Curated annotation (Swiss-Prot):
The lineage of its organism: Eukaryota, Metazoa, Spiralia, Lophotrochozoa, Mollusca. The keyword Transport applies. The chain crosses the membrane at residues 48-68, 92-113, 128-148, 193-213, 241-261, 303-323, 335-355, 362-382. One of its GO terms (cellular component) is respiratory chain complex III. A ubiquinone binds at residue 216. It comes from the Eukaryota. Its cofactor is heme b. GO terms for biological process: mitochondrial electron transport, ubiquinol to cytochrome c. Heme b b562 binds at residues 98, 197. Keywords: Electron transport, Heme, Iron, Membrane, Metal-binding, Mitochondrion, Mitochondrion inner membrane, Respiratory chain, Transmembrane, Transmembrane helix, Transport, Ubiquinone. Heme 1 (or BL or b562) is low-potential and absorbs at about 562 nm, and heme 2 (or BH or b566) is high-potential and absorbs at about 566 nm. It comes from Mytilus edulis. The gene is MT-CYB. This is Cytochrome b.
Length: 397
């Protein structure tokens, strides 16, 4: 009976351990970041995920501050941007941070996707699918934001991109008129785009939490693509230091863009107000959409170009089904490593071609690189089979 008295002692401590592990609310964050078990062999490519989180925070804060000074009206939108640049205290920096933050966002997201493709992270299908959802939301958000300054390239870019809806069978024209709010891109279009541009980031934050939830449920992948449940270290301090170093490197390049060369990745035609009566010689999107634009114009048929461009993006959903090998990482597949770098080279080449005028040889080059990308997806399962057969002959598997 004496031994049982301690069970009813109300003065006995109810919990043991650090405060971050016993407080119910803090414990959620602690288990997700501080004490999160991580594989011991993660390299620098895994830092781009945390950089994306930093980019999202930067874009949210700078966007909220800019929205306090922006006017969503076709007659005042351009002037409100000029007002931000000239009259608002540090408005030039705020606008440059938001404009170049989108470029940094896409640099990080393309690196993040490339890491997932190379190291086989897509085999965690739920995590991968939510990541692709985020990529599509980011593209939509970037397009909507590109139209808001209502400059010459913004206006005509919105006209060209929204016209793609017309290729949809039966409902295409109705969808186009609904998005425009009239018979052409107008004030109603700008208000719709501003509203969606303001709301979508909050949807993205929700999807980010789902992405992280499913990631932490199974644990992170690693460069070797092997199970690492018994070889893990806590996220802090091992990977917080790596992430902080990544933030410092990120900040150097980001602040160079903001303070020294803010127009390096921009388009000078957007410094002219939108003029519906004058079409630019070369209507083009921002650099991070150039690959899709090059694919679009490499196919003469309008509907065919739109469908192929759309498939070049949503094909990411099919990537897990193309993996037929035993190992996750491409470290064990030399031929597929070559195919991967062909894919990267084709993507960079299409980005460069998209910025060139619509004439030969750029049109034929765009078609060639688009064909390379299509063949990559067709060859991948076959190459996995060839390499697995070769490894079988060497008794490696």
């Amino acid at each position: 009976m004496v031994g049982n008295n301690t069970a009813y002692n109300t003065n006995a401590p109810k919990s043991v351990g650090p405060w971050r592990s016993t407080n119910k609310l803090v414990k959620i964050m602690n288990d997700s970041f501080y004490d999160l078990p991580c594989p011991v062999n993660l390299n620098a490519w895994w830092s781009f995920g945390s950089m994306l989180g930093l980019c999202l925070v930067i874009q949210l804060l700078s966007g909220l501050l800019l929205s306090a000074h922006y006017t969503a009206h076709e007659d005042m939108a351009f002037d409100s941007v000029v007002h931000i640049m000239r009259n608002v205290e540090k408005g030039w920096m705020l606008r440059n941070i938001h404009a170049n933050g989108s470029s940094m966002f896409f640099i990080c997201i393309y690196a993040h996707i490339a890491r997932g493709l190379y190291y086989g992270s897509y085999l965690d299908k739920t995590v991968w699918y939510f990541g692709v959802h985020l990529f599509l939301l980011t593209m939509a958000e970037a397009f909507l934001g590109y139209t808001l300054p209502w400059g010459q390239m913004s206006y005509w870019g919105a006209t060209v991109i929204t016209n793609m809806l017309s290729v949809s069978p039966v409902v295409g024209e109705s969808m186009l008129r609904y998005v425009w709010g009239g018979w052409t891109v107008c004030n109603a279009t700008l208000k719709r785009f501003y509203t969606l541009h303001f709301l979508l980031p909050f949807v993205m934050v929700a999807v980010v939490f789902l992405h992280l939830f499913f990631l932490h449920e199974k644990g992170s992948n690693n460069p070797l693509g092997i199970e690492s449940g018994t070889m893990c270290v806590p996220f802090h301090p091992f990977y917080t230091i790596k992430d902080l170093f990544g933030y410092v490197c990120f900040s150097f390049f980001f602040m160079y863009l903001v303070c020294v060369d803010p127009e390096l990745l921009g388009n000078h035609l957007n410094y002219w107000p939108a003029n519906p009566m004058k079409t630019p010689i070369h209507v083009q999107p921002e650099w991070y959409f150039m690959f899709a634009y090059a694919i679009l114009r490499s196919i003469p048929h309008k509907a065919g170009g739109v469908y192929v461009m759309f498939l070049s993006i949503v094909v990411l959903y099919l990537i897990p089904t193309l993996h037929t090998g035993k190992y996750r990482s491409l470290c064990f597949y030399p031929l597929n490593q070559v195919v991967f770098w062909v894919l990267v080279g084709s993507f960079i080449s299409l980005t460069w071609i998209g910025a060139r005028p619509v004439r030969e040889p750029y049109i034929i080059l765009g078609s060639a690189f688009q064909l390379f990308i299509s063949l990559v997806y067709c060859w991948t399962p076959f190459l996995y089979g060839c390499e697995m057969n070769y490894l079988n002959t060497l008794n490696f598997v």
